[in-house]
């Protein structure tokens, strides 16, 4: 037990130590171009020339958003065509067939929006070709899209008054060449050394200890797993994700993969401070997010290592903790840490089954995604926090009788309306779709039965499974309570719709706020200016997030994990 706690502490320490210098590097990449990866410039110039891009052309926020949305529409059709026809494409030694249109729609939308919700198993649902040219390609592009959006927001915040927020295509390319590619190579090298496969051979047939034969899937796993983690994508190469011994072979790879989930979102908060030359603001935001993250880690590690009281009543030894759904090579401590890390970001990868975690652990996992603000996905994590920051500035200004200002720009009704819509859209989507699915489950049992029955666990936990699915979809997370049978017409299409709304509405709103504030006249700070880089304001922002986001879900949480908790304890 002490060893497990030490492992958890070591991983958190690694994140804290490395996120600071990485944040400084990222700020240099977006601001000056005078970073240690500038030798990639010739490759970038080749890409610009090939695509007909002028990287020096400045865009206003509307042109920036137009470029962002256009490329995403293109990749959607690219992915749909390849996924449906993958059975006829090369690099398919196992003879896997194409996906059905509804599954391809869900898969394509899911990976295009950085969610990676998987209603299929990678071993049989994809080929090596689509793993590389749809899944891995999307994982780089969607991560870089979020980072490019944040780079545009940082540029707008840094300027005193400007009509432009940078060039989307330039930010997209350098996010890949100078941040995501190099880090993926390092992580991939470690995985290969530790035993993760990297090749294009078909399934292996091996004899088991009992004398039977077993087929084991392989493929270019080590190429895909690094960006799965670093890009907060989370879509597993294998069906059981990083629980699979070839996707996550050892405790070392577990540390590296778990570290990879959070390192860029953490570093981007520091990058904000360096870019704006307001390091104290970065520290305050980092502190608020870190506090919420550590609170979740403490809760989940405690409950998973304490075990299940119902199993205690049966007289079964639980000295190793609650081991249901856990890998024995990793243990409940490492699984609990991963469960918080993957839900506090938009990653969604797993090294154990979230459906088997204790009720309050499941509640923490859902709350992280329902709040969707603590570090979050690469780029979009701060952007979600940004909307609450605007609300907190406005409320704080009214409370103390000062003009609501953020970085020298007045926050007025227009920005507040957009921030409010962005903040309330998330709970609206989750709760409305959960209500619809619950209604269908109760009042259309024949339809539910025709789709396989949906739930393996009725009652409190069954409701939690449906709530978790839409929470995960709306938070662009992709993890799931896998007791839910979700590869059906109903779940593929409703989750796909939730994915689209929850990805693009916030990005459009947040970039619009940044563009509107950038156009405003800069007002120098004075004695009457509300300070946003203080601990007091950080606490205020934390409680605004808790009140607006977390409390919106309290009734639903009461019907699910909280009720389940009281049925066990």
From Swiss-Prot:
This is Potassium-transporting ATPase potassium-binding subunit. It is a multi-pass membrane protein. It comes from the Bacteria. One of its GO terms (cellular component) is plasma membrane. The keyword Mitochondrion does not apply. Keywords: Cell inner membrane, Cell membrane, Ion transport, Membrane, Potassium, Potassium transport, Transmembrane, Transmembrane helix, Transport. GO terms for molecular function: P-type potassium transmembrane transporter activity; potassium ion binding. Pfam families: KdpA (PF03814). Signal peptide: none annotated. Belongs to the KdpA family. The system is composed of three essential subunits: KdpA, KdpB and KdpC. The lineage of its organism: Bacteria, Pseudomonadati, Bacteroidota, Bacteroidia, Bacteroidales.
């Amino acid at each position: 037990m002490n060893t497990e706690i030490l492992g958890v502490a070591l991983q958190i320490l690694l994140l804290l130590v490395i996120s600071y210098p990485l944040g400084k590097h990222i700020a240099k990449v977006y601001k000056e171009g005078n970073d240690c990866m500038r030798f990639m410039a010739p490759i970038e110039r080749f890409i610009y020339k090939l695509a007909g891009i002028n990287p020096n052309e400045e865009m206003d926020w509307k042109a920036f958003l137009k470029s962002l949305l256009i490329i995403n529409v293109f990749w959607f059709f690219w992915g749909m065509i390849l996924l449906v026809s993958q059975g006829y494409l090369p690099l398919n030694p196992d003879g896997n067939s194409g996906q059905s249109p509804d599954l391809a729609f869900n898969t394509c939308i899911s990976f295009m929006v950085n969610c990676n919700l998987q209603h299929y198993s990678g071993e049989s649902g994809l080929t090596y070709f689509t793993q590389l040219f749809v899944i891995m390609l999307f994982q780089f592009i969607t991560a870089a899209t979020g980072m490019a959006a944040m780079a545009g927001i940082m540029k707008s915040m840094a300027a005193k008054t400007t009509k432009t927020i940078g060039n989307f295509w330039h930010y997209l390319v350098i996010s890949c060449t100078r941040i995501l590619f190099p880090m993926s190579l390092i992580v991939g090298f470690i995985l290969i050394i530790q035993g993760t496969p990297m090749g294009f051979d078909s399934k292996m047939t091996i004899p088991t200890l009992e004398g039977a034969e077993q087929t084991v899937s392989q493929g270019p796993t080590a190429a895909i797993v690094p960006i799965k983690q670093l890009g907060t994508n989370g879509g597993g190469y294998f069906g059981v994700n990083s629980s699979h011994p070839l996707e996550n072979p050892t405790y070392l790879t577990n540390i590296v993969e778990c570290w990879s989930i959070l390192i860029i979102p953490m570093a981007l908060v520091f990058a904000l401070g360096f870019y704006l030359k307001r390091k104290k603001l970065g520290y305050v935001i980092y502190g608020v997010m870190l506090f919420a993250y550590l609170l979740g880690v403490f809760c989940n590690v405690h409950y998973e290592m304490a075990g299940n009281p119902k199993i205690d009543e049966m007289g079964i030894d639980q000295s190793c903790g609650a081991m249901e759904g856990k890998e024995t090579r990793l243990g409940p401590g490492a699984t609990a840490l991963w469960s918080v890390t993957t839900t506090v970001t938009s990653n969604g990868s797993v090294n154990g089954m979230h459906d088997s975690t204790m009720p309050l652990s499941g509640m923490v996992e859902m709350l992280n995604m329902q709040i969707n603000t603590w570090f979050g996905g690469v780029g979009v994590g701060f952007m979600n926090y940004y909307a609450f920051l605007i609300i907190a500035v406005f409320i704080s200004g009214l409370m103390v009788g000062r003009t609501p200002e953020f970085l020298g720009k007045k926050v007025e009704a227009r920005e507040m309306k957009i921030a409010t819509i962005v903040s309330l859209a998330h709970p609206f989507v989750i709760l409305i779709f959960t209500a619809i699915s619950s209604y269908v489950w109760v009042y259309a049992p024949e339809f539910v039965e025709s789709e396989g029955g949906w739930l393996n666990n009725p009652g409190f936990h069954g409701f939690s499974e449906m709530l978790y699915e839409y929470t995960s979809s709306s938070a662009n997370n992709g993890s799931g309570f896998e007791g839910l049978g979700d590869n059906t017409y109903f779940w593929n299409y409703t989750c796909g719709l939730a994915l689209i709304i929850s990805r693009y509405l916030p990005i459009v709103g947040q970039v619009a706020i940044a563009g509107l504030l950038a156009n405003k006249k800069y007002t120098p700070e004075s004695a009457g200016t509300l300070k946003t880089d203080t601990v007091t304001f950080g606490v205020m922002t934390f409680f605004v997030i808790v009140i607006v986001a977390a409390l919106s879900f309290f009734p639903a949480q009461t019907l699910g994990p909280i009720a389940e908790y009281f049925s066990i304890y």
